[in-house]
Amino acid sequence: MYIINADDYGISEENNLAILDASKFGILNSTSVMVNTPFCNYDILQELLNNPNFRVGLHLNIFEFKTLRKILKPNSKLYDEHGEYHNSFGSVLKKSFNKEFLEELEEDYRLQIEEALKHFKPQHIDSHVHMHAIPNIFKIVCKLAKEYDIPYVRTQFEMPYFIPDLKMFSKTNLINLIKVCLLSSFTLANKKEIQKYGLNTNDYIVGVQYTSNMDTNTLYYGYRANSKNGRLTEALLHPTQNQQKKDNYKEYLSLLDEKLLLKLQKLLLR
């Protein structure tokens, strides 16, 4: 079983159009929507929602753009005086032990869920820059998913794998391997929360180890390594039609590759 998910619907019009195109003419079968951006186009999203075989979920975001709060809290630990988010994964990890920060975060996540529900019923939850994977934050997300009847929360266990391409052996890939180890270790704790709240999740993901290098090869070899014994594997990509963003444009082209679909189907029949 496999899910091929486009994160970041709503981050730009070019991303939105790439996601729509790849859902119609490619192998994309899922997306995650950022609702706190000026580019969250609900007309395009409705076309995706009209496809009964396409998953639409919520991409929780405290990394960039603005909070949905109408009244800003003075001296917020979550956003600046203009309501803008400027959080890195590292800064959020550090603040995730602060009760006041977690209370603010829960309120902002709740606002994003309720904004999504005005337009669609999310089938799953994940987050921008994997911030919901941080264990103290994951607990909040699972609690909210249960409260709002959202059945699936992404976890981030990725089996390290290698592909026959020397270009992939770079400093960036080594950094990504560290991310894989960190997120996979978090998943060991996070799956207990999944069980506690009776939620669903994936068994594996593909997309962290080769971030910025996702193409037909990395997708194929990633699924070959991670989708075994009927386990559910979710690939995450960030496609765009903006050719200046070469890595993301390459992901878009990969999603339109019919040969890749045939290869993935053969893997599932093993």
Explain the meaning of each model-derived region.
Residues 1-3, 9, 13-120, 124, ...:
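Terminal accessory/targeting
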Residues 132:
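Conserved strand-turn element in the central/C-terminal portion of the radical SAM core barrel
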